[in-house]
């Protein structure tokens, strides 16, 4: 094996020094929380999640050396195959939250809330491993979470405790496990970007994340084109028409089948993500979960000057009606999200059903 030369060693040392000089997540949270009891509880919960996600990053990095992490063990709550790594991820994050002031956890991997400390002030809704269909292909996966207050007098073991409005969230974020492990976090005053260092600490990359406008990228699963409602088709058709179409510019399409990966790209480059409801059985109201997928990503987007909608209004204006409720979900650059909303809301003869909700309409 070739020995690194002096220039290489110097570059590595410099990079390590730059990383070490960056403020840590723990310090940021301590400064934010101060002496406020609720903020302290939120900070402790986010720190616990960060610790769990750092452990999960190490487990994911083992890949096939740790066995067949992509093997299907059972059918989860959603009726989808529950992978071995789904179960491992769930155990890790819930285990980490046992040290936090959390009353209960609503996880994609559990039918009912997992009770931790019934008297604690907070609730956590979480997707421990978003994009698990990508495990065996070594494509980025992630963890998505939302922190809510426990309503006064609420039984945290009951799903009803979690059925809150999106504006009730106290914090939200995701961790993406890719070429490097990164976290996006909001506490309601902007969106912060952190990266995990080799010592297992999340260090600040950007405290003022902003979603760019004017990007010419959209993310949608084009294989479902013939199932979409007319407004969704029209939006995509206009993008695909390129410079000769009404948009007068060329667009690129992206689709990772891991919402965290698509969201992270949008935070870096702008653009839009669409997962509408469609005409297939089980897809009428979309596929993504409101509590632990749409709510937290929408919170992050809005705090970074982006936008998120179900096609009729802001995602964060919704109130959850079920622990695993599904919702059509569009998010990204504010200008593009507004355009898609106009395609659905303006009376221009687009289709016969309610926005994004397949042929039956939302309330039928």
From Swiss-Prot:
Keyword field: Carbohydrate metabolism, Cytoplasm, Hydrolase, Magnesium, Metal-binding
GO molecular function, one term: magnesium ion binding
Pathway(s) of this molecule: Carbohydrate biosynthesis; gluconeogenesis
GO biological process: fructose 1,6-bisphosphate metabolic process; fructose 6-phosphate metabolic process; fructose metabolic process; gluconeogenesis; sucrose biosynthetic process
Domain of life assignment: Bacteria
InterPro entries: FBPase_C_dom, FBPase_class-1, FBPase_N, FBPtase, Fructose_bisphosphatase_AS
Database matches in SUPFAM superfamilies: Carbohydrate phosphatase
GO cellular component: cytosol
Residues reported to bind Mg(2+) 1: 108, 127, 129
Disulphide connectivity of cysteines: none
Assembly with partners or alone: Homotetramer.
Name listed for the protein in its UniProt record: Fructose-1,6-bisphosphatase class 1
Organism: Xanthobacter flavus
Gene behind this protein: fbp
